[in-house]
Amino acid sequence: MSPLDDVVSPSQWMLWRLTGAALVVTLITSVIIVAADLYRHWQKRRSVGQIPLIHDGSWLSPKLQWRRPSFDAESEMARAYKKYSKNGKPFAWKTQNGLDIVIILPPECGKEYYSLPREKCSFMHWVRNEMFLNTVVDVTWRVPVEAVQVSSQSAPMDRLGRVIFDHLDRVLPLFLPGPGDHEWRQVNGSDMMDSLVRDLALGLFFTPGFGEESGLRRQMSAYMDGLAGQWFARQEAPYILEHLVWRLSPTCRRFQSTIQTVRQIVVPEVRRRIQQIRSNDKDGCFLLSDLLIKQALKRGTFCREGKTGEQETLEELIVDEIMFMYMETVAPFHLVTTCMVFRIMRHPEYVAPLREELDRALKICGGEWSFEIFNHTPKMESFTREILRLHNPTSISGARCVMEPITIPSLGMALERGTHISLPSRFIHTDPENYPDPMTFNGYRFYDEASGTCNVQKTLAPSEAWLPFGIGTSACPARLLGTRTCQALFAKILMDYDVGQMDDKHVPLQMWLLGIYVPSPTISISARRRDARRTHEALGSKLKPEE
């Protein structure tokens, strides 16, 4: 008999044994989790060989880090561009989710991969991997891309343009002073533009008033926020627990619930539109959601990669794509148009010339707001292009996931399946060899004063020195529609409102957030409704709110 038997009861002894076993299991599990994380990162580091790696020094997922290392990612990326890219050498960068590494190729190497077929180098597979979309939506389905390409054709663009301007007349007074209200109103710039764009984007997918009673706008916004929330939750978790987090995390479960709620609201409407299109009653079917359905019907299939009709209904498939396309619409519109407004606050000298140009264009177009007016606004085109150059949201562009082994001949580099590659677009756009005095905003940089023109094709056509829309086979298919929509929102604000000057001329207009440049959250916008009878001289007056 053990001496402990005199002081420890059998039940206590059993409790100790269970506690000890639990501690051992916890310890072993913890070791496995940490070891899996280290092994995952070791694999990724090994895959890039001797290529210099720029990262924060940690090889663990954020949740496993005792203390976050101090790391100025933007400065390190800029330094690597000067040290490696400018000398024709690649470098590797630990991506936003901390689990993958992307090889940043020198700009001149882009032509060696960006025209390869998608079966060899895929942008959408890169997006799926980066944003954990494998359990959310199949972004590799080609139908949405083809639908957006159709939207850029002349007739759909014309109809969508009229929808956008009509919708702007309805939503602008919800966030800024309406007709007859000439008092100054101050709002947070980024927040206001984000809310405005979310309302505007709904008009590209649904007819006015649809879903108001069921709270569609609120649910679509919850989808956007939830998509970001699930990304943060999964990228911070240890690699081996990522799928468990998706199934059990409250954030992820709320997001999944939001998807189901949106489906319940939108599926009946999608079903109605499918029947309408199949019955050849197509006159009222021209929104992006309609083009998506039409393209799927044209292809004769509603099945995505790895999916069958038994796994998901036709309507749910369409709704999932609408939700994701909505997010893809809102994010760039918000990031770009906010900076456009910030720039006229900092540079009011552009206000009068741009208004005069818009006024002339409106007269040419019979006084009717449509995308056609931007064919007569070269200064506006140059201003927009300078925004895209200096304030493009992305730090890298032209990203691809290698689907089949390829070679970059100029570097003598073989890339294996699963490798991520990209180009350093932000630093290409701010390289003085590409653009003189690159950090100075010049709204007329691309305006040819001699001919009075600015070619929109140069805005939309990617090159090794111009990458706001990606490049090659995976360049953004919505670049024309997106550019025109941003210009429409900016033009309506410019013509309908006075906007106060920015007092602090040195406050950064953007901030770096995990590889994305977002509008500064601290800048406020002061706006006042303009009097339509204001004289031409008043257009050039100093636009600053009264104290």
From Swiss-Prot:
Its cofactor is heme. Residues 528-547 are annotated as: Disordered. It catalyses: campesine B + campesine C + reduced [NADPH--hemoprotein reductase] + O2 = campesine D + oxidized [NADPH--hemoprotein reductase] + 2 H2O + 2 H(+); 2 campesine B + reduced [NADPH--hemoprotein reductase] + O2 = campesine F + oxidized [NADPH--hemoprotein reductase] + 2 H2O + H(+); campesine C + campesine A + reduced [NADPH--hemoprotein reductase] + O2 = campesine E + oxidized [NADPH--hemoprotein reductase] + 2 H2O + 2 H(+). One of its GO terms (biological process) is alkaloid metabolic process. Residues 534-547 have a biased composition (Basic and acidic residues). GO terms for molecular function: heme binding; iron ion binding; monooxygenase activity; oxidoreductase activity, acting on paired donors, with incorporation or reduction of molecular oxygen. InterPro entries: Cyt_P450, Cyt_P450_E_grp-IV, Cyt_P450_sf. It is an enzyme of class 1 (oxidoreductase). Heme binds at residue 476. The keyword Iron applies. GO terms for cellular component: membrane. SUPFAM superfamilies: Cytochrome P450. Its EC number is 1.-.-.-. The keyword Iron applies. Campesine G features good insecticidal activity against the global honeybee pest Galleria mellonella, which supports its future application in the development of biopesticides. It is found in: Membrane. Keywords: Alkaloid metabolism, Heme, Iron, Membrane, Metal-binding, Monooxygenase, Oxidoreductase, Transmembrane, Transmembrane helix. The chain crosses the membrane at residues 18-38. It comes from the Eukaryota. Pathway: Alkaloid biosynthesis. It is a single-pass membrane protein. Belongs to the cytochrome P450 family. PANTHER family: CYTOCHROME P450. Cytochrome P450 monooxygenase; part of the gene cluster that mediates the biosynthesis of campesine G, a dimeric indole piperazine alkaloid that shows good insecticidal activity Galleria mellonella. Within the pathway, cpsD acts as a dimerase that simultaneously catalyzes one C-C bond (C3-C3') and two C-N bonds (C2-N16' and C2'-N16) coupling reactions between campesines B and C to produce a heterodimer with unexpected 6/5/6/6/6/6/5/6 eight-ring scaffold called campesine D. This is Cytochrome P450 monooxygenase cpsD. The gene is cpsD.
